[in-house]
Amino acid sequence: MDEGTFLFLLDTNRAKVLSFSDFNKRNFAPFFFFFFFFFFFFSSSSRIREFVCSATWTRTRALLCTKKHVFLYCFHNTSRENRIFKANKPDVMKDGFAVYMQRATQELFFTNKLNYLLVCVPLAIISNGGGWGDGITFTFSLIAICPLAERLGFVTEQLAGYTNSTVGGLLNASFGNATEMIVSMYALKAGLLRVVQLSLLGSILSNMLLVLGCAFLFGGMSRKEQYFNAEGVMMNFGLLLLAVMGLSLPALLHFTHTELHGTASELALSRFSSTILLLIYLAFLYFQLVTHTHLYEDEEDDDDDDDEEELVLGFWDSIVWLGVFTVFISILSDYLVATIEGASASWDFSVAFISVILLPIVGNAAEHASAVMFAMKNKMDISLGVAVGSSTQIALLVIPFCVIVGWFMDKPMDLNLQMFETATLFTTVITVAFVCQDGRSNWLKGLVLILAYILLSASFFFHKDPALIGRQAASSINEWNEEF
């Protein structure tokens, strides 16, 4: 609907139009919305065919249409393309509740062969309770998180199917990062601050190189070239470079030995920088979702797929399954954090390699699957929103949030990455920004990004983290003192 000035109540027998200005003067808005929601959900009258409300305040609009869908959004822009929730979505229960349950269950658990790995969920729980060893528990937990994260991505895609491409990409990035956020919170609680830093750094690296590279590679196999909105993507890279600045300054302060008050200066600078980065992220959300939505809309595409056929879950069912999968990921994340050092000793892999490479690959399974899926459907703006948008969200939201949470938990969580990690992050952002600057992708660009990630993986395999070595040495000394 255009600039909202009327309220419409459409019935098969009558139609009534009430001037919005008169309606607002009577101050009936709160009563109207209470009555509307009560009527909307509990009315069983078959005469009502359409009930549409469009109301305008300064920057809040409500659009409610059809008897089975409620759509609320807060954009000043009221164009159809910029509505958060799409109005023309099919009823997934049109064939009956039994058919819907059968189809939803099959899609959730039996259509993807990766779901066979869900058997590792009870094995991880049994291993943790039965004392099978840290290496075995860590292995089962790591494997079990992979299908859970992928199913989280599937359910997120179902939920995103009720939204436009901008919010859909944001939803995929947000719930894709749920695994990293949960693991980080448990590691922060356990005092494994370096694991938090390295795992989040690894998430950025894997999203920008591995996930985006796979999206370019598999998307380019069926098309010679694919196109995306370069202006919106380069805005993300500008924010990523700003985040790199915020992450590198505490490290530079430390390694140049110019701190005014030693480590206290690094910690104070990290907390201040984290606050600034969080404010930047909020400003970026307003920029992305309100003032410059056109930069993040999907490019028009002639061979666009029929989204209606892909939706097998209802809106609220998708939200419920998001919660279920998140709970199981939380349980397994607790096991991961508790056994990571024991697994490092069992596998003879460094904690740094496990944190930077193995954990993010599993945690980013949701982004990996959804980004590749959207790229193969030639929806490159959503694919870029998942991969690059997820990296931006980790750099501007998750990492600063962990610093602030650590502050309240009295944990000295800071942004002091080692020089090696800072250099890898900077070179990664520059490389990917150069690849994406022309707004075009092909399979060769994807292969370049994947090979770059393999190079980084090899470098972390041979890298010794001084901070982790010192922590492990201190832990060994404490254990020796307790024994003797």
PLM segments and residue spans:
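Intrinsic-disorder-associated, low-complexity terminal segments enriched in Asp/Asn/His/Tyr and depleted
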Residues: 11-13, 22-27
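Hydrophobic alpha-helical segments, chiefly the membrane-spanning helices
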Residues: 2, 15, 44-484
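Long, low-complexity Q/N-rich tracts
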Residues: 31-43
